[in-house]
Amino acid sequence: MAESLHRAFICGHPVAHSRSPVIHNFWLKQHGIEGSYERRDIAPEAFSLFIREFPRFYMGGNVTIPHKESAWRLVETRDEAAETIGAVNTLWLQDGRIMGGNTDTYGFAANLDMELAGWEKNAVATVLGAGGAALAVVHALQSRGIRDIRIVNRTVSRARAVVDRFKGGTSAHAWEAVPDLLSDTSLLVNTTSLGMHGGPEGHIDLAPLPDSAIVTDIVYVPLRTPLLASAAARGLRTVDGLGMLLHQAVPGFERWFGVRPEVTPHLREIVVADLEAGK
């Protein structure tokens, strides 16, 4: 176990694009911790072995696509968010056991808290998409007391599956319902790849949204997605997706290294610069 001191990882397949090492290694340096956070490209067929073996070399780590659901099945104990969402993105060791958690729900809410405090008051939320990211967002919204959450997906059965998982306060809708849903939406959340570099193109008419509405996108490449650009042009308040990435990293770092780091403008600048350099 001595080899594992002050080492953490992010594993995925592929994983070279991950900005998590930029975030965690910045915090390690900032807090004077002699440690490392590194990328591990683990193919799906090797993931089970990696989970069994990582405690020999690491204190814990993060899990990204395509391993989040597999990690959920393999860990010994899960936190409430991971249990509900059905996916694990953070691993740590406790009393010799491998623990799993999901910090995406925390990251989503913390990002909005920092940018637009009070966002959850009297909110009516419309969530675009019904994948894993949508599950984390809906969990965050429900945990903040929002009881009118509309899940919209091109395949309505997937939206219904989200509703079945969360029960009360959620409803499933077809994509064609978006114009009607927006008329009383106070928080619009995009969890799809719409507007992402390399993702599908598309346009959502935001004219029906109330002037007081907030529009947020979990996509952060590009930072200003077409959806956010349209919202800003209408004078609506917007929140980009980079903050979710930054904030979701906080709980894991604290568990592994014993210090709760802060998300600061300086950290954001560093990650934005890294994103720009990687274009």
Swiss-Prot record:
Keyword field: Amino-acid biosynthesis, Aromatic amino acid biosynthesis, NADP, Oxidoreductase
Protein family according to the UniProt entry: Belongs to the shikimate dehydrogenase family.
Assembly: Homodimer.
TM region(s), chain numbering: none
Protein's job: Involved in the biosynthesis of the chorismate, which leads to the biosynthesis of aromatic amino acids. Catalyzes the reversible NADPH linked reduction of 3-dehydroshikimate (DHSA) to yield shikimate (SA).
Gene Ontology biological process: amino acid biosynthetic process; aromatic amino acid family biosynthetic process; chorismate biosynthetic process; shikimate metabolic process
GO molecular function: NADP binding; shikimate 3-dehydrogenase (NADP+) activity
Leading EC class: oxidoreductase
Keyword Membrane attached: no
Binding site for NADP(+): 80, 129-133, 153-158, 218, 241
GO cellular component: cytosol
PANTHER family linked to this entry: BIFUNCTIONAL 3-DEHYDROQUINATE DEHYDRATASE_SHIKIMATE DEHYDROGENASE, CHLOROPLASTIC, SHIKIMATE DEHYDROGENASE
Catalytic residues (UniProt): 68 (proton acceptor)
Highest taxon of source: Bacteria
Catalytic reaction list: shikimate + NADP(+) = 3-dehydroshikimate + NADPH + H(+)
Pathway(s) the chain acts in: Metabolic intermediate biosynthesis; chorismate biosynthesis; chorismate from D-erythrose 4-phosphate and phosphoenolpyruvate: step 4/7
The EC number(s) this enzyme carries: 1.1.1.25
Protein name: Shikimate dehydrogenase (NADP(+))
InterPro entries: Aminoacid_DH-like_N_sf, NAD(P)-bd_dom_sf, SDH_C, Shikimate_DH, Shikimate_DH-bd_N, Shikimate_DH_fam, Shikm_DH/Glu-tRNA_Rdtase
Residues annotated as binding shikimate: 18-20, 64, 89, 104, 220
Taxonomic source organism: Chelativorans sp. (strain BNC1)
